[in-house]
Amino acid sequence: MIEFGDFYQRIAKGNLSHWLDTLPAQLSAWQRESLHGKFKQWFNSVEHLPALTPTRLDLLNGVRAEMDTPLSPGQLEGIEKMLRTMMPWRKGPFSLYGIDIDTEWHSDWKWDRVLPHISPLAGRTILDVGCGSGYHLWRMLGAGAQLAVGIDPMQLFLCQFEAVRKLLGGDQRAHLLPLGIEQLPELAAFDTVFSMGVLYHRRSPLDHLYQLKNQLVSEGELVLETLVIEGDRNQVLVPGDRYAQMRNVYFIPSAEALKCWLEKCGFVDVKIADMCVTSTEEQRRTDWMTSESLAEFLDPNDPGKTIEGYPSPLRAVLVARKP
């Protein structure tokens, strides 16, 4: 089973220590009661991976690990086999000793859009809500974060994260917890909180914004990345059964409406930092994610629309401060 003792030890001293009042019991209950049917299979693959320490590790420009003495073809084949048992790989890419995990999403492109607009991460304690396999946690460390904590209830992502961690030298500055934001107490302990690709999946988006705010220290920064539509402050799309083949999409506001929502929730200095149409180069089917992707979710006769007839995915980055 996955042990969280290193994380408990890491937060025992500092602003997050009060989380220990509830977190160990939550995660123990999760291990007892909530494991996915395939979890043991996925975690068995993690356990069969070698614990490697790279000679060169680049988290600033990507997630890339290399050895001075290359691994043997047999070692590489064994590692790749274990990693492929954890498909699909959606967020990345990762370059691990010559094994290139070409993920569905170019999450590095999103990071390049976000990073120029946010406060420097050096020395910060960070929360990444809905972090997926943790790709951006590693990039946060590359940008100088002291501690990067990701939460995501999808258990495959936890195993993917632990697999990458094992191949990167067991770094304890990044941690992924199998929780949703609604399971966190009001910690008010993070310098920066990221919520990227989550808001449109929430039935109550304003409640989500308050949940994010409650995790921030005073003067802390929220980085919010989500689907938006073109339009003024009064424009919000409420899709029907599906949006781009996704069932659980509830509200897609305009960027201006989202700015108003943030201000209504008490955030200040709200800025629309970036807007970008998602391309089929950024999100696509790969050898590591072989099912349908964005190209199949768009109208084949009009790529400016989803297959359901809605505007095709447009993503915005907003940055705001908790006073």
Curated annotation (Swiss-Prot):
Catalytic class of the enzyme: transferase
Recorded hits in Pfam families, A to Z, give: Methyltransf_9
Q: Does the keyword Transferase apply?
A: yes
List, in alphabetical order, the Gene Ontology terms for molecular function in this entry: methyltransferase activity; transferase activity, transferring alkyl or aryl (other than methyl) groups
Entries under InterPro entries matching the protein: CmoB, Mo5U34_MeTrfas-like, SAM-dependent_MTases_sf
Does Chaperone appear among the keywords?
no
One biological process term in Gene Ontology:
tRNA wobble uridine modification
**Any idea which UniProt keywords this protein has?**
Transferase, tRNA processing
Kindly list the positions annotated as binding carboxy-S-adenosyl-L-methionine.
K91, W105, K110, G130, I181, E182, M196, Y200, R315
Enzyme Commission number(s) from the entry: 2.5.1.-
Which reactions is this enzyme annotated as catalysing?
A: carboxy-S-adenosyl-L-methionine + 5-hydroxyuridine(34) in tRNA = 5-carboxymethoxyuridine(34) in tRNA + S-adenosyl-L-homocysteine + H(+)
| Function statement | Catalyzes carboxymethyl transfer from carboxy-S-adenosyl-L-methionine (Cx-SAM) to 5-hydroxyuridine (ho5U) to form 5-carboxymethoxyuridine (cmo5U) at position 34 in tRNAs.
State the similarity comment: Belongs to the class I-like SAM-binding methyltransferase superfamily. CmoB family.
Note the subunit structure. Answer: Homotetramer.
Name recorded for this polypeptide: tRNA U34 carboxymethyltransferase
Look up and give the organism this protein is from. Answer: Serratia proteamaculans (strain 568)
Recall the taxonomic lineage recorded for the source organism.
Answer: Bacteria, Pseudomonadati, Pseudomonadota, Gammaproteobacteria, Enterobacterales
Name of the gene encoding the protein in the UniProt record? cmoB
